[in-house]
Every structure is written in structure tokens, then in C-alpha cells.
């Protein structure tokens, strides 16, 4: 028997900011959509992804 949550906020949002979260820290703010990563995590992992780091 599976329990399905009910109420106004029980379904996933298919559009808008609530539908996209960072794959690293799961925040909804500052998302780079092609990477599905927030700007803070991007700065941390840019070198690992393959971007050149300039000082």
C-alpha cells in the first residue's frame, strides 16, 4: 500500500523556480540551467567540470 500525500502542495511543480534545484546543494536560487547547478556550487566545482580558472 503506497501513501500518496494530499493537499495543495503535494504535486511536483512542472515549471518555474520551484521545479529546478541545484544538483549539489538542492537550493532553488541562482541556478545555471544548462548545468542545473547554483552559482555558488559552480564556482566551487568549475575546475572539476572542465572550465579554465583565471585569477
Curated annotation (Swiss-Prot):
Keywords: Metal-binding, Ribonucleoprotein, Ribosomal protein, Zinc
Record keyword RNA-binding present: no
GO molecular function: structural constituent of ribosome; zinc ion binding
Cofactor note: Binds 1 zinc ion per subunit.
One Pfam family per UniProt: Ribosomal_S14
UniProt cofactor(s): Zn(2+)
InterPro entries documented for this protein: Ribosomal_uS14 (IPR001209), Ribosomal_uS14_CS (IPR018271), RIbosomal_uS14_euk_arc (IPR039744), Ribosomal_uS14_sf (IPR043140)
Calcium is among the record's keywords: no
Record GO cellular component, one term: cytosolic small ribosomal subunit
GO biological process, one term: cytoplasmic translation
PROSITE patterns (alphabetical): RIBOSOMAL_S14
Residues binding Zn(2+): 22, 25, 38, 41
Record region (Disordered): 1-20
Database matches in PANTHER family: 40S RIBOSOMAL PROTEIN S29
UniProt family annotation: Belongs to the universal ribosomal protein uS14 family.
Protein name per the record: Small ribosomal subunit protein uS14
Organism of this sequence: Encephalitozoon cuniculi (strain GB-M1) (Microsporidian parasite)
Organism ancestry: Eukaryota, Fungi, Fungi incertae sedis, Microsporidia, Unikaryonidae
Gene this protein is translated from: RPS29
Amino acid at each position: 500500500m503506497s501513501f500518496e500525500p494530499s493537499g495543495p502542495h503535494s504535486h511536483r511543480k512542472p515549471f518555474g523556480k520551484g521545479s529546478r534545484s541545484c544538483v549539489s546543494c538542492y537550493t532553488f536560487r541562482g541556478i545555471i540551467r544548462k548545468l542545473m547547478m547554483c552559482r555558488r556550487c559552480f564556482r566551487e566545482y568549475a575546475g572539476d567540470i572542465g572550465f579554465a580558472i583565471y585569477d
